[in-house]
Amino acid sequence: MILENLFKNLIYDPVSVLGLLVFYILLVNLPISLGAFFQKKSFFIVRVLTILINFLITLQLLFRWSISGHFPISNLYESLYFLTWGITMGQLLIEREYQSPIIPSIAIPIELLTVAFACFVLPDDLKISSNLVPALRSSWLVMHVSVVMLSYAALIIGSLLSASVLFINKNKPLQIRSSSTGIGGFKISNNYPLNELVEPIEFSHSEELDTLSYRSILIGFVLLTLGLISGAVWANEAWGTWWSWDPKETWAFISWMFYAAYLHMRISKGWQGRRPALLATTGFLVVLICYLGVNFLGIGLHSYGWIFG
């Protein structure tokens, strides 16, 4: 009966059903990812489930696109799933380089919370696809919003990787020798042996995590820069002004300045170890405020749908 209802709903409301499936698979994947620290076979299961999650979100977004007739990043519900897609894709790409249970253990909780927020916190009217206002009926919608959302995904992953570096070194001095340009301390192989997954985390692991964090943040910063530029061009085309300093634009600029300072300190000042890791970890809150926090103000051109109104 449950399966029968599921298939019926899948026909009439595929977006919601696929969204719920993603949530439940993430719910199953979370304890398995934590168990991967003790059983190496669990890491393979986690990776397979993450691939399935990414595929289901892709299907969900495609269904949403076919129903609405526009790329599905026009409201908060759609953007939350697109963000989750970006984080899962980033997780899978990193795991190709560094097969450690640390990666899914930091990514999956965020993915689960993001999907849970979309499924159970957002009001139903935000889950319904609606027609775009004339100003949003532009190819800039895909070029601007998708790039910004992918930058958020990369920046979140980078910040969480830095948090993991701080956590695994909380009771000992942190003297990272990894290179900010990715040359010195990047000792990662595609054939990293699976039997090393359950070994205690050594100093070299911190170097690798730190370098992965730096690279993720660098990618996110480049994408955010492109997103801000494309957004300014779009704003001038739609409203005749390059920048209006609404809350989202202001916090996007703050986020850009924050990560620019992080990269400057690492590249120009040679920061290594605990200080850049603390700075990058704090960046998670900056991105969270930029993406979700300003929605609680309910004002501006980028509110993504007022949550409670």
Swiss-Prot record:
Location within or outside the cell: Cellular thylakoid membrane
Membrane association type: Multi-pass membrane protein
Protein's GO biological process: cytochrome complex assembly
Keywords: Cytochrome c-type biogenesis, Membrane, Thylakoid, Transmembrane, Transmembrane helix
GO cellular component annotations of the record: plasma membrane-derived thylakoid membrane
TM ranges: 18-38, 43-63, 67-87, 102-122, 148-168, 216-236, 250-267, 279-299
Protein family according to the UniProt entry: Belongs to the CcmF/CycK/Ccl1/NrfE/CcsA family.
Functional note: Required during biogenesis of c-type cytochromes (cytochrome c6 and cytochrome f) at the step of heme attachment.
Protein name per Swiss-Prot or TrEMBL: Cytochrome c biogenesis protein CcsA
